[in-house]
């Protein structure tokens, strides 16, 4: 299983931010990647068709196959996006539909970030493609995916490949997880509109005065498991009621706090094969600064890469390896016994 949760927020100083978790049973050889302008990105593995990208972008991904595969990222125009698992619902074609171009599902994020500015551009681009059932070389199959994008205006969309083609959800609440589709998750929210940060009122039963045991009773009923539907509800609830950030730093802090509600420790979620599904990394990004932030399962320090600090016309990819060592700040002197 490859899980994932994502959300977008807006700060009071009009910064648009996006964040996601990456939950998986294996760690691909991932790193932070800056793809410069005109680098050239494939559409398919089986055909040597390369599209030069107009815009540079940064995000988390892999360089283990022919073209860089990004799982999420932000481009120089402030468009942000991510791929998320869409098991049993994603539908891919065997051949391109008439008038469209075939694309491997894992290259969608790279192609979109490399060539789009707004969510309107994303919709136009993706409706010109047919997502093909072409296996990923590393996984050995075409992973079932859906996609979410947020632009500098703050609008978030969800793109889902299904039996009817591509379904586009506009003006979403800016939250997404995994299967089922976005519309189902949005409808499911209606069953939880009574969940609130406010404490319930005391009530009388005869002469008995009943009071809550403590703070937080207004959240009773919010599910605590790790299913996609439960994670969607928790992220939506935390997003709605978390105090609004004043600036980018506060926004990034809020994003990591909100997504901590769906972080999965090793051993808590197991597959049918007994493998552990866990949160490998959590990332956040800002449309205005083009900064990309992340922290790892093994190292909870927030690291950052600034897209605009690099040569965006470079001929080569710019990569940043993971530092997996836990970064603990020691506040007093440690005596080493001789």
UniProtKB/Swiss-Prot annotation:
Activity modulation notes: Hydrolase activity is rapidly inhibited by lysine modifying reagents.
PTM notes: Expressed as an inactive precursor that is cleaved autocatalytically at Gly-3/Cys-4 to generate an active enzyme. Processing exposes a catalytic N-terminal nucleophile residue with a free alpha amino group.
Phenotype when changing residue 63 to S: Slightly improves the specific activity. Has little impact on the substrate affinity, but exhibits 12.3-fold increase in catalytic efficiency
Temperature dependence: Optimum temperature is 60 degrees Celsius. Is very stable at 30-40 degrees Celsius.
Application of this enzyme or protein: The triple mutant BspPVA-3 (T63S/N198Y/S110C) shows improved catalytic efficiency and conversion yields, suggesting that it could be a potential candidate for industrial production of 6-APA, a chemical compound used as an intermediate in the synthesis of beta-lactam antibiotics.
Gene3D superfamilies membership: Penicillin V Acylase, Chain A (3.60.60.10)
Keywords, alphabetical: Antibiotic resistance, Hydrolase, Zymogen
UniProt note: pH dependence: Optimum pH is 6.0. Is very stable at pH 6.0-7.0.
Pfam families: CBAH (PF02275)
Catalytic activity field: a penicillin + H2O = 6-aminopenicillanate + a carboxylate
Propeptide, residue positions: 1-3
Annotated EC: 3.5.1.11
BP term (GO), one: response to antibiotic
Active site: 4 (nucleophile)
Gene Ontology molecular function terms on file: penicillin amidase activity
Record's subunit section: Homotetramer.
Family from the record: Belongs to the peptidase C59 family.
Job description of the protein: Catalyzes the hydrolysis of penicillin V to 6-aminopenicillanate (6-APA). Exhibits high specificity for penicillin V. Penicillin G and other related compounds are hydrolyzed at less than 10% of the rate of penicillin V. Among the cephalosporins, cephalosporin C is resistant to cleavage, whereas cephalosporin G is cleaved at about 1% of the rate of cleavage of penicillin V.
Protein name per UniProt: Penicillin V acylase
């Amino acid at each position: 299983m490859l899980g994932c949760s994502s959300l977008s927020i807006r700060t009071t100083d009009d910064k648009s931010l996006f964040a996601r978790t990456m939950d998986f049973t294996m760690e691909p050889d991932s790193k932070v990647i800056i793809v410069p302008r005109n680098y050239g990105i494939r559409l398919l593995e089986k055909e040597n068709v390369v599209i030069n990208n107009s815009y540079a972008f940064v995000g988390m991904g892999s360089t283990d196959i022919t073209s860089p595969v990004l799982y999420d990222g932000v481009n120089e125009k402030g468009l942000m996006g991510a791929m998320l698992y869409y098991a049993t619902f994603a539908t891919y074609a065997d051949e391109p539909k008439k008038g469209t171009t075939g694309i491997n599902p894992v290259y969608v994020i790279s192609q979109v970030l490399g060539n789009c500015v707004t969510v309107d551009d994303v919709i136009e681009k993706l409706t010109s493609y047919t997502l093909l059932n072409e296996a990923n070389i590393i996984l050995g199959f075409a992973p079932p995916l859906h996609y979410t994008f947020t632009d500098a205006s703050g609008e978030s969309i969800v793109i889902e490949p299904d039996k009817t083609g591509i379904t586009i959800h506009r003006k979403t609440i800016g939250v997404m997880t995994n299967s089922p589709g976005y519309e189902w998750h949005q409808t499911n929210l209606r069953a939880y509109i009574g969940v609130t940060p406010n404490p319930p009122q005391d009530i009388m039963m005869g002469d008995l005065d009943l009071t809550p045991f403590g703070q937080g009773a207004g959240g009773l009923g919010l599910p605590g498991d790790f299913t996609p539907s439960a994670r969607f509800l928790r992220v939506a609830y935390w997003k709605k009621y978390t105090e609004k950030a004043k600036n980018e730093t506060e926004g990034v802090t809020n994003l990591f706090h909100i997504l901590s509600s769906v972080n999965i420790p090793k051993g808590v979620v197991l597959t049918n094969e007994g493998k552990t599904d866990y949160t490998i990394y959590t990332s956040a990004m800002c449309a205005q600064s083009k900064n990309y932030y992340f922290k790892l399962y093994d190292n909870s320090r927030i690291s950052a890469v600034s897209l605009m600090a690099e040569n965006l016309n470079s001929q080569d990819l710019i990569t940043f390896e993971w530092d997996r060592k836990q970064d603990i700040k020691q506040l007093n002197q440690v005596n080493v016994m001789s």
